[in-house]
């Protein structure tokens, strides 16, 4: 009986301390950071290339409204594709630069949460590229150093399907 009371008291004490232990937690440790909007739900998307080519979009966002203009940049990163290939057990090659058009620099204006979507145009694949599997692995980086970029949602892969 004595042990039951002690156990109940200790259990109640543990329960009460568990509910009150985090009253002073600081949840604002990340601050403002940049990320790829599409990467929040998926790390990649498939893009079908026809005889006319293909179009895609990618969007740079901030976790909070910008207090001043923020300059970011999308860069093609082969390491992103290496990790993607490893996770997907695939063997995509980086899409050659002459096969796509993209404005890599974006600006999120003061007071805004996101930049206008960056448009990517993929040209029809030249004959010498047909038969290989290509992807466009993108990483978001800070162009002016004013806002850090998250490591988890800063990359996005466009895997290309040629028909």
Predicted regions: what is each one?
Residues 126-135:
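Short glycine/proline/serine/threonine-rich loop/turn segments at secondary-structure transition edges
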Residues 1-9:
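Bacterial N-terminal signal peptides that target proteins for export
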Residues 18-21:
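C-terminal motif of bacterial Sec signal peptides marking the signal peptidase cleavage site
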Residues 27-62:
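Beta-sheet-dominated interaction scaffolds and their linkers
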Residues 84-106:
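Short beta-strand and strand-turn-strand segments in soluble, beta-rich domains
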Residues 161-163:
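Conserved small/polar residues in nucleotide/adenosyl-binding loops
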Residues 107-114:
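Short proline/glycine- and polar residue-rich coil/turn motifs
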Residues 144-156:
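Beta-sandwich strand segments
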């Amino acid at each position: 009986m004595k042990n039951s009371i002690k156990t109940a008291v200790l259990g109640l004490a543990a329960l009460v301390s568990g509910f009150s232990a985090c009253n002073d937690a600081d949840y604002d440790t990340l601050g403002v950071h940049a990320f790829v909007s599409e990467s929040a739900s998926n790390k990649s998307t498939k893009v079908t290339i026809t005889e006319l080519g293909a179009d895609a979009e990618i969007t740079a966002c901030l976790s909070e409204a910008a207090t001043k203009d923020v300059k970011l940049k999308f860069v093609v990163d082969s390491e992103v594709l290496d990790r993607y290939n490893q996770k997907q057990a695939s063997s995509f090659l980086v899409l050659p630069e002459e096969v796509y058009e993209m404005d890599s620099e974006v600006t999120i204006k003061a007071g805004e949460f996101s930049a206008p979507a960056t448009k990517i145009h993929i040209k029809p694949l030249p004959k010498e590229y047909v038969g290989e599997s290509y992807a466009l692995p993108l990483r978001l980086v800070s162009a002016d150093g004013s806002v850090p970029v998250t490591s988890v949602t800063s990359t996005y892969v466009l895997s290309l399907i040629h028909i």
